[in-house]
Design a protein with these regions (language model features):
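Walker A/P-loop phosphate-binding motif and the immediately C-terminal alpha-helix
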Residues: 26-64, 176, 180-182
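Phosphate-binding/switch loop-helix module in NTP-utilizing enzymes
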Residues: 105-158
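Conserved P-loop NTPase nucleotide-binding/switch module
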Residues: 140-183
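Residue-level signature of catalytic and energy-coupling elements of molecular machines
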Residues: 24, 35, 61, 69, ...
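Phosphate-binding loop that captures ATP/GTP phosphates
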Residues: 56-58, 62-105, 120, 124-127
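Short beta-strand "acidic-cap" motif of Rossmann-like dinucleotide-binding folds
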Residues: 56-61, 164, 192-193
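C-terminal lobe/tail of nucleotide-utilizing enzymes
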Residues: 1-12, 180-269
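Extreme N-terminal, non-catalytic leader segments
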Residues: 1-37, 78
Length: 269
């Protein structure tokens, strides 16, 4: 086989990415079996909490069909490339950088129609052909399930661990079990489970009420051989403040039960 200049350049970019990634303290992919369980909310708020605490943090969004990181950060921007064609992650306030396909689209409502190989290649480009600054933490937001995007992320990011988000509902737990099985097959470590929206904070009195059978998420975590890292309440008021103030919950409603639990979770990482 003939080695081309392009092959050599690709190899050098790979080496540089591996060198850069080896210095990142923790690389965490937020995943789930089911959709709509709170992945993007967890991912973005953990990243913001860490960045506000002084760490240098990157968010890589590999959810190409539902890229919500930009929306969850209330960050409109366009990704630029430098002279060498390297993508420049978008700054999102002090210590935080974001790379998402949403910031590459001409029309914000445009659908990304990529299939398997195109998505695998895009993840590779976001990792090896992007000028990421030196980071302490990298959070990867993923689509639900066990598809190409998450697999590509584990291939492209050495040392990547998973945080598995689920609700306490039986269907969410059943799909989470498949995600855990995927991780075992991919030999990817599971850092822990997050139970999201398993309790409800009463908007009137602030009392926290369980929505699902007690211990369901905890038992799932134990079966998966990973710790239950957090129980995040369904907090409608914190969510409302986030929307109204145009900031993630940890910034928009720092005194809420949800923000407190998210900060505790960030501290455990
Ligand atoms: N703990 C929570 N309290 C209130 N709303 C939440 C909470 N977690 C997620 N949400 C809301 O639920 C919806 C789905 O969450 P999202 O993070 O987008 O899930 P996913 O990324 O898994 O699809 C969003 O509208 C989000 O704002
Ligand atoms: Mg999402």
């Amino acid at each position: 086989m003939i080695t081309t200049l392009a092959d050599i350049e690709k190899g050098l970019r790979r080496q540089e990415a591996d060198r850069r990634l080896s210095r990142v303290r923790r690389k965490l992919l937020v995943m789930s079996g089911k959709g709509g369980v709170g992945k993007t909310t967890v991912c973005v708020n953990l990243a913001v909490a860490k960045a506000r605490a002084g760490a240098r943090v990157g968010i890589l969004d590999v959810d190409f069909h539902g890229p919500d990181v930009a929306g969850a950060l209330f960050l409109e921007a366009r990704v630029e490339a430098d002279g060498a064609g390297m993508l420049l992650p978008v700054p999102a306030g002090e210590n935080l950088w974001v790379l998402t396909v949403q910031h590459l689209l001409e029309d914000p409502d445009e659908a990304v129609l990529w299939r398997g190989p195109r998505k695998m290649r895009a993840v590779e480009r976001f990792v090896t052909e992007a000028a990421w600054p030196e980071l302490d933490f990298l959070f990867v937001d993923s689509p639900p399930g066990t598809g190409d995007e998450s697999l590509a992320a584990f291939r492209q990011v050495p040392g990547l661990e998973a945080i598995l988000v689920t609700t306490g509902h039986s269907l969410s737990l059943a799909d989470a079990a498949k995600a855990a099985s995927f991780l075992r097959a991919a030999r990817a470590p599971l850092a822990g489970v997050v139970d999201c929206m398993g309790t409800l904070v009463c908007p009137r009195c602030g009392e926290e009420t369980a929505l699902y059978p007690a211990g369901a998420a905890e038992a799932f975590a134990a079966r998966s051989g990973a710790p239950l890292l957090a129980r995040l309440p369904w907090d409608l008021e914190a969510q409302r403040l986030s929307e109204a103030r145009g900031k993630p919950v940890v910034e928009a409603a720092p005194d809420s039960l949800l923000a407190g639990r998210l900060r505790e979770l960030a501290d455990r990482l």
